[in-house]
Amino acid sequence: KDILRNWVIAALSQPKNKVSVELSKIQYGSILKGARIVVTGGSKGIGFAMADKFIKEGAEVVITGRNENDLKDAVLKLGQYSHYIIFDNSNIDGIETFLFDCTNILGGIDSLVLNAGISLHEGNFLNVTTEGFSKQLNTNLTANYFISQSFLKFKLGRNENGSMLFVTSETAGKSNDLPYGLSKNALNSLVEGLARRVYQRGIRINAIAPGVTYTNMTKGKRQMTDDYSNDSVAGRFLLPSEIAEVACFLLSKASICINGEILYCDAGSHLKVNGFDQDYSL
């Protein structure tokens, strides 16, 4: 196996604190050869990192987003095997047209990665507004529900194999009273509910649940003190490229026996432990 090691520096809350992260890439350039993949919310953050990884592994990718300038910049960086479509994830009426356009660009869709989502970071149950609640549930849950429904109708109607990958969150594994966590928890339930229904029809459905990752969505958390590291097993923010490696595996044929799984990418922070001591060391 060809293993390429990249060393990256992940910034923590304080500039003086740095951590070195080693990433290993296996079968570089071949594991997704010929795959046609759509990534929603693919212009930045985890979505962009996934698109970049997929292309480097041989796939052709369509990314979506609402800001055309961001999409153009992303495609310029991603290269010739990338394309973009302007699509608002909450535009339920435009879903079938969106999938039709993606099919025309790629010649078909093998995998759909439902990554687009928002968080308003209310911080407290009492701060949640009806407008904010609806906005997050519509974008994170309702849109993904009906996009996946249309995609399954499309694939099953043609007797085609394929896969779907949802990007949820480690917060979905915990009791949560905020709209973001509620919506991601519901997505986990959707993945588990659908997966067994379609596996024998040649379609796999899984999810990855990242911990707090170094993206635009977590800018607020990055202003926190080093106390954050006490709440995370990793003691740092995760990197989008780390999440992308896992996503690549789940879309590849190497994971053909994996279906209906919520794979937490948070170094184990979601795990429940006895006691209240947050020191994870021995």
Labelled PLM ranges:
Residues 4, 17-26, 259-282:
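Short C-terminal tail/terminal secondary-structure segment
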Residues 36, 43-45:
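Conserved glycine-rich cofactor-binding loop
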Residues 163-200, 212:
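Catalytic loop of short-chain dehydrogenase/reductase
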Residues 236-265, 270-271:
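C-terminal substrate-recognition "lid" of short-chain dehydrogenase/reductases
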Residues 123-125, 129-137, 228:
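Substrate-binding pocket helix/loop in short-chain dehydrogenase/reductase
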Residues 78-93:
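Rossmann-fold cofactor-recognition segment
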